[in-house]
Amino acid sequence: MRRYIEIYSIMLRNSLIREMSFKANFLLWMIVEILWFCGQIVFFSIIFGQVDRIGDWTKWEVVLLVGTHQMIAQLFQAFFFVNVANIPELVRTGRLDSLLVLPIDSQFAVSTKQFALDSIVNAALGGVVVCVSLSQLGIMPNPMSILLYLVALGFGVAVHYSIMLCLAAVSFWIVRAQGLVYGYFNFLNIARYPDVIFPRIFRMIFGWVVPVVIIANIPARLLIKSFGQPVPLMLHLVIASTIVFWLSRVFWKFALRHYSSASS
């Protein structure tokens, strides 16, 4: 475990050095993400100019949900997206060989090679929006609620990582699988919508089979006490995320057995 922590810290440091070597690019992408996030807030503001509620969600509760989704999506993008999205290219070019020969777990090797640290700033912006929303709602969460919320964010990132890893692993059979990976990255935006807008069957699918909707809805509900009890909410998130992470691990090992290296 200590060796993995040391390797992870080295990769983080190298990514920071690389990002600082291209400051203009770092700032440009950060600005683009901020503008995109502001666009989401404006989008829901326009909707609430016509209605008072979306289901049982008020305006500032939805803004809190959008801020929560921003934090999860940007943390996922900061620590995992670049690496997972690059797996199809590693397989196609045979450069995956250089990672498989390392004396570390192959999934760890492909998942921690590079980081997009500019996304951390955008995740912090989501946190600011959550705090403003809580203030507007007159909610002062207790330390336990805050702790559960932060833990739930981590599980949300794990769900995104697990699903995307499974899609990227399809590249062991389909040479160009980038479309699946980037398609899911766009699809995950449905997590920013209140779950009540979906029909019951889709709430079941997006809550258990492909649990993308719950990853932001459950953390948000943990802060808005009137929306549910914390124990069943956390239990749902923990069970769903654990299952999907385990399945991604199994599928990665299965897919790896079908890899034909460039040297073979």
Language-model features: locations:
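Hydrophobic transmembrane alpha-helices and immediately adjacent juxtamembrane helices
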Residues: 1-264
